[in-house]
Curated annotation (Swiss-Prot):
Activity regulation text: Inhibited by tert-butyl 4-(3-thiophen-2-yl-1,2,4-oxadiazol-5-yl) piperidine-1-carboxylate (RF1) and 1-(thiophen-2-ylacetyl)-4-(3-thiophen-2-yl-1,2,4-oxadiazol-5-yl)piperidine (RF3).
GO molecular function: DNA-binding transcription factor activity; transcription cis-regulatory region binding
Organism (species): Mycobacterium tuberculosis (strain ATCC 25618 / H37Rv)
Lineage, opening ranks: Bacteria, Bacillati, Actinomycetota, Actinomycetes, Mycobacteriales
Keywords, sorted A to Z: DNA-binding, Repressor, Transcription, Transcription regulation
InterPro entries referenced in this protein's UniProt entry, alphabetically: EthR_C, Homeodomain-like_sf, HTH-type_TetR-like_transc_reg, HTH_TetR, Tet_transcr_reg_TetR-rel_C_sf
Name used for this protein in its record: HTH-type transcriptional regulator EthR
Region (Disordered): 1-24
Quaternary data: Homodimer.
Null allele phenotype: Cells lacking this gene leads to ETH hypersentivity.
PROSITE patterns per record: HTH_TETR_2 (PS50977)
Additional notes on this entry: Binding of inhibitors to EthR induces a conformational change in this repressor, which is then unable to bind its DNA operator, consequently allowing for increased transcription of EthA and bioactivation of ethionamide (ETH).
Length: 216
């Protein structure tokens, strides 16, 4: 926690500034973890690394988190909820009736949110195979986002803007799973992958074509 120059100047001589609060320490641990994940996987990061980076002792670390895996779970939970809240805001305040822009805005929520936290995204995806908590967190929100997508597809069909082709929920599932794999491959620079600068346009094209195209 920092204090402004003005508040520091008003402190009596010889007094120490306030110690970091519990919230500050927790945030410091989370920030340290995200920074370290930029350079190496969670398996190569120790609790001592996290404690040292946060400016606390190892015993103090365990006051806030039971393990480094719990730190990752918290980081991923924050990113996932950030994306979910942004999508909820869009759903409650629709700003564009153009169908391509409507879907672009929604997909961009995930592109921007997860793209701003690539290290956490990579670590979270890797942890799904070994962490029940991470897998459940991701599954819960994917199901929520798929249900929302299906509801929008149904609404577009009900107003006559989109044809009734594949079942909406199945189409929404395939599109969201495609987003997940394609975005994360681009963020990680995998080969093959769509270049990050073009991945949003690519996904929007596929979504619009799939939702509004007729069966052949």
């Amino acid at each position: 926690m920092t204090t402004s120059a003005a508040s520091q100047a008003s402190l009596p001589r010889g007094r120490r500034t306030a110690r970091p609060s519990g919230d500050d320490r927790e945030l410091a641990i989370l920030a340290t973890a995200e920074n370290l994940l930029e350079d190496r996987p969670l398996a190569d990061i120790s609790v001592d690394d996290l404690a040292k980076g946060a400016g606390i002792s190892r015993p103090t670390f365990y006051f806030y988190f039971p393990s480094k895996e719990a730190v990752l779970l918290t980081l991923l939970d924050r990113v996932v909820n950030q994306a979910d809240m942004a999508l909820q805001t869009l759903a409650e305040n629709p700003a564009d009736t153009d169908r391509e822009n409507m879907w672009r805005t929604g997909i961009n929520v995930f592109f921007e949110t997860f793209g701003s936290h690539k290290a956490v995204t990579r670590a979270g995806q890797a942890a799904r195979a070994t962490s029940v908590e991470v897998a459940e967190l991701w599954s819960t929100f994917m199901q929520k986002w798929i249900a929302y997508t299906a509801a929008v597809i149904d609404a577009e069909r009900d107003r006559g803007a989109a044809p009734r082709t594949l079942p909406a929920h199945e189409l929404a599932t395939a599109l969201n799973l495609m987003n997940e794999r394609t975005l994360f491959a681009s963020f990680a620079g995998e080969q093959p992958s769509v270049p990050e600068a073009r991945v949003l346009d690519t996904l929007v094209h596929i979504w619009v074509t799939s939702i509004y195209g007729e069966n052949r």
